[in-house]
């Protein structure tokens, strides 16, 4: 059995961070438990030491929360305004990074020996974009490049901004990549052995394939849609994941309630294989199982997780179940 964790909104039925068991022999989810009460813990990250870091809030202030390996609250680091929307761990420097969508900020925090966090530095973006959701900067992602630079996706300004980070966590802007106007870059992932990155754009529901030079510079190579050609509804792309072998890429569509499956060719470019329904509403996140045999998608608005069997040879997905209850889930990860 594998432990699988869920970050959630707590606007309706959810009370915080949940854990369930996943059986890799059968693909079944079971035994949902509330492990930590926290308002709107919408994104989660674990350190190798087992500490859990979450989007957090306390007494009307927003920020980040840290929890012990047995899910006990260690501390909050909060400020006026909205909490973060993304958190990630830098094991080498002993830092945690956060993205704040509403404030247009990227932040760094020091991890102390007992797992508690202290604020180190922040950078505030400037600018806007042509889409109605781009009136101001909206930093949606902050994580490491393969060469340990900090990379951020700003949905509000159509920019990917790269930072140098010193050993103490101080941020220095290094490079900026500009996407197509109104694209709304949300998350980015890097191929394990090609010099390519895959940028998912929320507002125009596309994936940009980018050459990456290892120094923070990107060059556009391909743009491909996450939706069927004849689809005329809302464009609202969300999560993006690579298979461990680097042969396949997956992306979720929130309004279309689907997952797009792509083959990765030898030059790093993408070919669409299929778009499969997730049998839920608003599949904001999904994850591949550690053995790569399954894909689990979670739904914010229908309170269910869908399990797909994954063909490792073809990359294609076959639904196994869609009736496991998880309230308001918007983040899923194994630990």
List the predicted regions and their residue ranges.
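Short loop/turn segments immediately following the C-termini of beta-strands
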Residues: 9-11, 57-59, 101-103, 111, ...
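A short beta-strand motif characteristic of beta-propeller blades
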Residues: 30-36, 72-78, 121, 127-132, ...
